[in-house]
Amino acid sequence: SREHARVGADNEVVVHAASRRLTALTLDNLDDLSRPCRSCVSWELDPVAAQRAQDSGDVALEKEAWLSAVLLEWGSCGFVAYTGSQPIGHVLYAPPSMVPRAASFPTSPVSPDAILLVTAFVQPAQHGAGVGRSLVQAAAKDLLQRGTRAIEAFGDAQWERPACLLPAEYLSMLGFQ
């Protein structure tokens, strides 16, 4: 199927493919993130603070606080994909200075001129339909328009199931090296 995209009002990217649309992530649609990611602050907090949030049950509040801070200090940091009104995937990205967990990877640090593709998720029923590619392309377009020189991501070479790290093979298919 052919797709084409246009940027609409309020930073909404409309992708014409079976009524799929991508909308900028905001506090208003934060609850549309998939459950594993909505209740995870693995990237957003350092490991100790993430465990503390998990133990206290404040994960959703911490996720909202992180998103609010990024939106206020830096601007748009993700997109949510929908088919009709149903959320089917998302992508998150931010400057590495706003992603505490990024510093804990052996291949850190992220280049100073790069933005970190934090994570992406596509509902299993949508795998192979181009949703993930559309999300990453929307992120890349947004970042290019903002003058970003590079996008970096951490990948999992042993990926077996959805997790906070994207499969390295998938990132490679999208052009990451």
Regions found by a protein language model. Name each.
Residues 57, 69-76, 82, 87-119, ...:
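Conserved acyl-donor/pantetheine-binding loop and adjacent beta-alpha core of acyl/acetyltransferases
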